[in-house]
Amino acid sequence: MLIKLLTKVFGSRNDRTLRRMRKAVNVINAMEPEMEKLSDDELKAKTAEFRARLEKGETVESLIPEAFAVVREASKRVFGMRHFDVQLLGGMVLNDRCIAEMRTGEGKTLTATLPAYLNALSGKGVHVVTVNDYLAQRDAENNRPLFEFLGMTVGINLPGMPAPAKRAAYAADITYGTNNEFGFDYLRDNMAFSPEERVQRKLHYALVDEVDSILIDEARTPLIISGPAEDSSEMYKKVNKIIPHLIRQEKEDSDTFQGEGHFSVDEKSRQVNLTERGLVLIEELLVKEGIMDEGESLYSPANIMLMHHVTAALRAHALFTRDVDYIVKDGEVIIVDEHTGRTMQGRRWSDGLHQAVEAKEGVEIQNENQTLASITFQNYFRLYEKLAGMTGTADTEAFEFRSIYRLDTVVVPTNRPMIRKDMPDLVYMSEAEKIQAIIEDIKECTARNQPVLVGTISIEKSELVSNELTKAGIKHNVLNAKFHANEAAIVAQAGYPGAVTIATNMAGRGTDIVLGGSWQAEVAALENPTPEQIEEIKAAWQVRHDQVLAAGGLHIIGTERHESRRIDNQLRGRSGRQGDAGSSRFYLSMEDALMRIFASDRVSGMMRKLGMKPGEAIEHPWVTKAIANAQRKVESRNFDIRKQLLEYDDVANDQRRAIYAQRNELLDVSDVSETINSIREDVFKVTIDAYIPPQSLEEMWDIPGLQERLKNDFDLDMPIAEWLDKEPELHEETLRERILTHAIEVYKRKEEIVGAEMMRHFEKGVMLQTLDSLWKEHLAAMDYLRQGIHLRGYAQKDPKQEYKRESFSMFAAMLESLKYEVVSTLSKVQVRMPEEVEELEQQRRMEAERLAQMQQLSHQDDDTAAAAALAAQTGDRKVGRNDPCPCGSGKKYKQCHGRLQ
C-alpha cells in the first residue's frame, strides 16, 4: 500500500527514466527546423563530422540529440516517414543498454535505425539480431536506403554464405542476421586454423529484436556444433520394439499405486522413471531379445549405455508427441519450436533422444553426435561490450533481464492510446465444450464481417480447430509449421473482413496484421501496376478498413493459456495496433495442459461448488486469478531452470574464454617455438619426476621405467643406465639436464632436415589440432559430470560447488595433457625430407577441412527461429581408429592416414 502511494507521488522508476529522456526529445524537436534547411549533401556530411568528433574524444552519448535529429530528417527524405517522439524515446532507451518494451505496430524497425546509426559511428560495428532469416533480410533491405544515404554500409549475415561474403557482412557498419548465425559464427571462428578463416570482428554493440524470444525462451538451449560419434542405430531399433510392452502408471506416486504400471511420467519436469515392476519386466524382455545376458542387472556398470537407450526410448514414447513436439516430413523427424510453432530444420535433440524418436517413427536413424563446441545465448550475448533489445512483451520478465543480463526494462508509451478490449477468460469442464464455444464465437464474428485470429499452442490443436471449422462450413487459413511457406501471404490478409486465421505461436511475429488486409501485398501481386490501379486498390482497402473497424477490429481467440503470460500477451498484441479497435478472449478447459498440471484441483473444486452443467462456462475473477497464479508458478520454475543452467554454464564459460583466448593468440602468431621450448621443459620435468623423485636416493630411481617411457612417448633412445654406470658423478640435476639437452638436440636435427620455417608451421598446426581434440573430449567429460552432479546433494554437499571444484581439476588436467600431447607428438614425428612434412601438414589440413564441413548445417531453413542443440553433420561414415584405412593400403587407419607421424 505504502509503495503504491509513494509511486503515485514520485512516479515509478519507468516514469522518472522517461521524464529524463523527454528533455532530450525536446532538444531534438528544437533542432528539426535547422535540419530541414540542410541540403542532402550537408545532411550526409554530418556522418563524417560525427566520426571526427568521436576521434577527438567526444562520447557517443553527447552526440545523441544531433545524431537522432539527422536520422529523423534523413528518414523523412528517404522514406517519407518521420520518427514519432515515442520512437525517439525508444531509441534512447536502446542506446542506454536497456530493453525497450514497445507495443505491436509502434514501429520498432524504424526505432532501431536511431541507436544503430549512433553506435555505428565509432566504426566498431553494430549487430542487429532478429529471430529468423526472413526478418533479417526484410529489415536490412528496408533500412538500407536510409543508412546508405547517411554514408553507412549494411551487411546481411545468412546461413550457408561463403566465408568471404560473411567477412564482408561483418566488416559493414551495420550487420543484420539471426541470433543462431551470429552464435555459430563465433563458435566457428574459434575452430579456425588460420586468422584468415575468421569472419567476426570484436563484439561491440548488439541490438536484439524480439529480445524476449531470444534471451529468455531460447536461453535453456545451447548452440552446439557437433560431429558424428559411433553408430548405434541398431540398438535404438531393438530397444524401441520393447517399449510398447510397458504400461504407463496411472498415478505418479508409486508408493501408493497398486495397479500394473511399469513407468511413471512427471509432466512438470518432463522425466520418465521405471517402477520396480517395470524394471523386472524390461530386464526379462532385454534377455529375451538377446540384448542382455540372463542374471545381469540393467543398473550394472557394464549396462550403462543400455540404460541410456531404454530411458531415451521411454521418453520418446511417453513425452514426445507427433505434430506437437515434432513433425515427420520426407522421412525425417523435424523438431517444432514450442515457443514459436516453427519447424527447426537441421536441429536435433541430444543424448540419443532424436534417434529414439526416429526409431519410434520408423524413419532412418541418423548417427549420434559428439560436441565439438558449444555456448548458450546467455553467455554469447554477454560477450558484447554493449547490449540492448526491444520487444512488445518484456515487462513480465523485467526481473530476469535485470538479474541475468543486467538490462533494465523501460516501457515506452504508445503513440496513440490502446483501445483493445481484453475480455475475461471462459473456463469449460471439457475440451469438446471449449472447442464448440470457440466455433460459436467465430460464427458470430464472421456474421458481422469481423476478422478473427485463433491462437493455438501446437500443430495438433490448430488442425483440430481447423477440422471443426471445416465441418461448420467456415472458410479459414491455417498458419502452422506444416504450412509456414505461405506465412507472409496469410498474415498479410488476416485483417480482411470476415477472415478467419488459425495460427500456432509463430503468428507472424515481426509482421503487422493490417485491418482490411494489406493493400501493398495486392499491389506487389500485379506485374506492372499503373498509378490508377494503385489508387483503386487503396480506395477498396479504405472501404474494407472502415468496415472492419465498424465490426470491432481484429478479434483474438486464445484456445488455451500458455505457460508464460508473456506469450499470451504476444497473441493479444496482434490486435489493437496503433490505436485500432480490437478485442481478445481466452477459452480454457480443465483438460488443458496448464490447468491439468498446475491449477486443476483448486479450479475444478470451485467449478463443482458452483454446480456447473455441461456446456456452461465459468467466468469469475477468482478463476482468472488462480490461472494467473499457475502461470506465475511455471514462469518462476522456468526462470529457476534458466538461472541454474547459467550458473553451471558460467563455469564452462570461464574455461571456454580461456581456451578461445589462448587459441586466438596461437592463430595470430607465426612462431610458437618459444612456447614449445617452455612446455618441453615442463613436460620432461614432470616425466622425470615420476621415475626420479626430487631429492631422492639413487635406490629409489626407476631407470628402466624412465627409459621405456622416453622411448614409447617421445621416441627417444637414451642409454641412461649406461650413463650412470660410466659416470658415477652424474647426480639428479645433471642427469635431468642431459636428458633435456639430448631431447632438444634430436629435435633440432629434425628441424635442420626440413627447415625452420616449415617446422614452425607444423608446430603451430600440432598445437591447434591437439587443443581442439582435448577441448572436445573435455566438453564431453563436463557434460557427463553435469548430468550426475546433483547426486552429490544426497551426501550433504552443494552440487554447484562440487561441479566448480571438479571441473576446475578437469580443466587443469586437460591443460597438462595438452602440453604432454604436443611435446609427445612433435618428438615422435619422423621426418627425412621437407616433402614429408608437407604431406603431414596436408593430412592435418584435410582433417581441419573435414571438421569445417561438419560445421556447415546439413539443412537450412529461412524461417528457423532459434536454438536447440544443433548437430551439423556430414554424410560420411566416421572411420574408426582400428578400421582398415580407406586409402586401400591394408593398414589400420591409426597406422596410416589417421596418424600424425
Swiss-Prot record:
<feature type="binding site">
    <location>
        <position position="887"/>
    </location>
    <ligand>
        <name>Zn(2+)</name>
    </ligand>
</feature>
<dbReference type="InterPro" id="IPR020937">
    <property type="entry name" value="SecA_CS"/>
</dbReference>
<dbReference type="GO" id="GO:0046872">
    <property type="term" value="F:metal ion binding"/>
</dbReference>
<dbReference type="GO" id="GO:0065002">
    <property type="term" value="P:intracellular protein transmembrane transport"/>
</dbReference>
<feature type="region of interest" description="Disordered">
    <location>
        <begin position="858"/>
        <end position="891"/>
    </location>
</feature>
<comment type="function">
    <text>Part of the Sec protein translocase complex. Interacts with the SecYEG preprotein conducting channel. Has a central role in coupling the hydrolysis of ATP to the transfer of proteins into and across the cell membrane, serving both as a receptor for the preprotein-SecB complex and as an ATP-driven molecular motor driving the stepwise translocation of polypeptide chains across the membrane.</text>
</comment>
<dbReference type="Pfam" id="PF07517">
    <property type="entry name" value="SecA_DEAD"/>
</dbReference>
<dbReference type="InterPro" id="IPR011115">
    <property type="entry name" value="SecA_DEAD"/>
</dbReference>
<dbReference type="InterPro" id="IPR027417">
    <property type="entry name" value="P-loop_NTPase"/>
</dbReference>
<comment type="subunit">
    <text>Monomer and homodimer. Part of the essential Sec protein translocation apparatus which comprises SecA, SecYEG and auxiliary proteins SecDF-YajC and YidC.</text>
</comment>
<keyword id="KW-0997">Cell inner membrane</keyword>
<feature type="binding site">
    <location>
        <position position="896"/>
    </location>
    <ligand>
        <name>Zn(2+)</name>
    </ligand>
</feature>
<dbReference type="GO" id="GO:0017038">
    <property type="term" value="P:protein import"/>
</dbReference>
<dbReference type="InterPro" id="IPR000185">
    <property type="entry name" value="SecA"/>
</dbReference>
<dbReference type="GO" id="GO:0005524">
    <property type="term" value="F:ATP binding"/>
</dbReference>
<keyword id="KW-1278">Translocase</keyword>
<keyword id="KW-0862">Zinc</keyword>
<dbReference type="GO" id="GO:0008564">
    <property type="term" value="F:protein-exporting ATPase activity"/>
</dbReference>
<keyword id="KW-1003">Cell membrane</keyword>
<keyword id="KW-0067">ATP-binding</keyword>
<dbReference type="Pfam" id="PF01043">
    <property type="entry name" value="SecA_PP_bind"/>
</dbReference>
<feature type="binding site">
    <location>
        <begin position="105"/>
        <end position="109"/>
    </location>
    <ligand>
        <name>ATP</name>
    </ligand>
</feature>
<dbReference type="Pfam" id="PF21090">
    <property type="entry name" value="P-loop_SecA"/>
</dbReference>
<dbReference type="Pfam" id="PF02810">
    <property type="entry name" value="SEC-C"/>
</dbReference>
<dbReference type="InterPro" id="IPR036266">
    <property type="entry name" value="SecA_Wing/Scaffold_sf"/>
</dbReference>
<dbReference type="InterPro" id="IPR011116">
    <property type="entry name" value="SecA_Wing/Scaffold"/>
</dbReference>
<protein>
    <recommendedName>
        <fullName>Protein translocase subunit SecA</fullName>
        <ecNumber>7.4.2.8</ecNumber>
    </recommendedName>
</protein>
<keyword id="KW-0472">Membrane</keyword>
<feature type="binding site">
    <location>
        <position position="897"/>
    </location>
    <ligand>
        <name>Zn(2+)</name>
    </ligand>
</feature>
<keyword id="KW-0547">Nucleotide-binding</keyword>
<feature type="binding site">
    <location>
        <position position="512"/>
    </location>
    <ligand>
        <name>ATP</name>
    </ligand>
</feature>
<dbReference type="GO" id="GO:0043952">
    <property type="term" value="P:protein transport by the Sec complex"/>
</dbReference>
<feature type="binding site">
    <location>
        <position position="885"/>
    </location>
    <ligand>
        <name>Zn(2+)</name>
    </ligand>
</feature>
<dbReference type="InterPro" id="IPR004027">
    <property type="entry name" value="SEC_C_motif"/>
</dbReference>
<dbReference type="Pfam" id="PF07516">
    <property type="entry name" value="SecA_SW"/>
</dbReference>
<dbReference type="InterPro" id="IPR011130">
    <property type="entry name" value="SecA_preprotein_X-link_dom"/>
</dbReference>
<keyword id="KW-0479">Metal-binding</keyword>
<dbReference type="GO" id="GO:0005886">
    <property type="term" value="C:plasma membrane"/>
</dbReference>
<keyword id="KW-0653">Protein transport</keyword>
<dbReference type="InterPro" id="IPR014001">
    <property type="entry name" value="Helicase_ATP-bd"/>
</dbReference>
<dbReference type="InterPro" id="IPR036670">
    <property type="entry name" value="SecA_X-link_sf"/>
</dbReference>
<keyword id="KW-0963">Cytoplasm</keyword>
